[in-house]
Curated annotation (Swiss-Prot):
The active site is at residue 95. One of its GO terms (biological process) is actin filament polymerization. PANTHER family: METHIONINE-R-SULFOXIDE REDUCTASE B1. Zn(2+) binds at residues 23, 26, 71, 74. The gene is Msrb1. This is Methionine-R-sulfoxide reductase B1.
Length: 116
């Protein structure tokens, strides 16, 4: 069952360059390219966040396996975390809207970045 409507334009679905994905609204580091993997859904998929507080999580009503995720800094809606649905047993799958992300290529991060 799909949780989100797909309208196309998922520019980061098949994007696998080294770097860091940050919140498109505030620039907070969210995901490293090292945690990104190919998945059959139309949205970019990640296994983990860069920082423990990169995302805030809210239970999805009537769906215990899904959490709505938003930027841990500004609250921008990002997508969902699907528990135990990652590429390896016990891993989560973060299914994130490309429009909520901005990509920073490796070597172009801010000096304090811990991303990649």
């Amino acid at each position: 069952m799909s949780f989100c409507s797909f309208f196309g334009g998922e520019v980061f679905q098949n994007h696998f360059e080294p770097g860091v994905y940050v919140c498109a609204k505030c620039g907070y580091e969210l995901f490293s390219s090292r945690s990104k993997y190919a998945h059959s859904s139309p949205w970019p998929a990640f296994t983990e966040t860069i920082h423990e507080d990169s995302v805030a999580k809210c239970p999805e009503k009537n769906r215990p396996e899904a959490l709505k995720v938003s930027c841990g800094k500004c609250g921008n809606g990002l997508g969902h975390e699907f528990l135990n649905d990652g590429p390896k047993r016990g891993q989560s799958r973060f299914u994130i809207f490309s429009s909520s992300l901005k990509f920073i290529p490796k070597g172009k991060e801010a000096p304090a970045s811990q991303g990649d």
